[in-house]
C-alpha cells in the first residue's frame, strides 16, 4: 500500500514538473503589427442628454444613430413595444424613464467612474487586436456603452454592447 502511494505521488510530481517545464512559448502572441479601427459610441450619454424641449425629435435622432441597439434596448431588454407609437406614448415613456430618480442615480454613479473612457478604450483596443489576430477575416464590432442592461452582449453580428453600471465595483451603492 505504501509503495503504491509512493508510485502515485511520484507520478503526480512528474506530471506537474512536465507541465511546468514543457511550455517554452510566449504566453501571448505579438500583436504590435495588428491594426484595427475602434468605433466607440456612448448610448448612455446620448440617452441621458435628452432635454424636455422637443424630446420626441431627440428620440427620433437616437433611433437613427443607433438603428440596431435602440429597438434591442427598449424592446428586448426593456420589454416595450416600439411597433405602434403613433401617439408618442412610447417617447413619453422613454422620457419618464430617463427622468426617473433610479435612472438618474444609476447614470450619475456610472458617470462618476466612467465619464472618461480613455484607459478603457486602450484596453478595448488591445482586446480587438487579439480578436483580429485570431480571427483575421472577422468584422471588428462597433462598441456601444450603456447602462441598465446585461453586463455585455452582442446585438447583431457587428455590435458589442457593454453595460458600464455592471462594472462599478463592490463599493457601489447601486
Regions found by a protein language model. Name each.
Residues 19-22:
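C-terminal motif of bacterial Sec signal peptides marking the signal peptidase cleavage site
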Residues 1-11:
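Bacterial N-terminal signal peptides that target proteins for export
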Residues 24-96:
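N-terminal mature-domain "stem" immediately C-terminal to a signal peptide or N-terminal signal-anchor/transmembrane
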Residues 93-174:
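Acidic/His-rich structured neighborhood in mature extracellular/periplasmic domains
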